[in-house]
Amino acid sequence: MLEINIHQQLGSLNLTVNLHIAAKGVTAILGRSGAGKSSLINLIAGLTTAQRGYIKLGEQTLYDHEQGINLAPEKRHIGYVFQEHRLFPHYSVAKNLKYGCKRVDNAHFLQIVKLLGIEHLLNRYPSSLSGGEKQRVAIGRALLTKPQILLMDEPLSALDLPRKQELITYLSQLANQVDIPILYVTHSLDEIIRLADQLILLEQGKIIAFDLVVNVWHSDILADWQSETQKISLLELPLNIQQPIYKMVGLKLGKQHIWIPATPHYKIGDKLRITIASKDVSISLDQVQHSSIRNILNGVITQIVEHNDRVDIAVLIETHQIWASISLWSFDELALKIGQQIYVQIKSVSL
């Protein structure tokens, strides 16, 4: 577990953080520029020093103002991945990976290299690598030091979209397989959805939210970060049924299911996180009997939000909320009201 209780004055920013982070999983840190995100992980890494408070990682005290403890960065057993890859241009990939390791554990080396898909890059030099490949090497180098925690400061921010998609797949696999906590600074809600278990929302140096991603997502506190043109529903559901003939799998939603294309990465019992755009959800008063849409679910209207060009409808299905966006015309014609039983038709689901 990571325990942080610190205070630091950074110009006009008063950074005050008090939290406990679990010993495993990805905790995303979200906030606007200047909110204190990078400052917080730099304090944890020992690159800067708080004016008071303490930082503990497991049984080890990294910093304690009252006790006069302030371990040097290299003694904190922390892996740090920066926005820039910071590889040595005159070293091969293999040498870059091993840099900083007192003794190289060959089995661990091969495990990390395979996990990040960089076996074929070992004899190459940074100048011949893509941005995504460079960041994978930088992540590998951090992991090979066998850190007790991994800090990542916007590792995808310098990459173009194809490279981001490439690297986020590796990061997702990494998050599931490494047995250490990961602190992940980002501006991207998409990265949070794909990678994070918990979310810290920082605003002007203060924590205004810290909870499971799904819980923060559905709270009003994240509204300013989301699209003004539609709502995005975020659900985390167990995979509990397969339809092998049509290569589909069903995610359990109470007594109902959401069907998605089968993927080899998941098995029965695994929890999958999905998003549903409100523009991809329509509403009917009766269950449609013959439709090409597979996901038709029964629910109750719990909230109605009218806009100039549309109406957003929140529908409670079992214990999960899904948003639909419909036209003003449709809203008037259907005469929808809170508490009404209706059916939603979901045209598209994203993993």
Curated annotation (Swiss-Prot):
Broad class of the protein's primary localization: membrane
Gene: modC
Reaction catalyzed: molybdate(out) + ATP + H2O = molybdate(in) + ADP + phosphate + H(+)
Occurrences of domain ABC transporter (ranges): 1-229
Keyword Lipoprotein among UniProt keywords: no
Record-listed ATP binding positions: G31, R32, S33, G34, A35, G36, K37, S38
Name of the protein described by the UniProt record: Molybdenum import ATP-binding protein ModC
Topology of the protein relative to the lipid bilayer: Peripheral membrane protein
Entries under InterPro entries matching the protein: AAA+_ATPase, ABC_transporter-like_ATP-bd, ABC_transporter-like_CS, Mo/tungstate-bd_C_term_dom, ModC_ABC_ATP-bd, Molybdenum_import_ModC, Mop_domain, P-loop_NTPase
GO molecular function list: ABC-type molybdate transporter activity; ATP binding; ATP hydrolysis activity
Function: Part of the ABC transporter complex ModABC involved in molybdenum import. Responsible for energy coupling to the transport system.
KW Zinc-finger (keyword) present: no
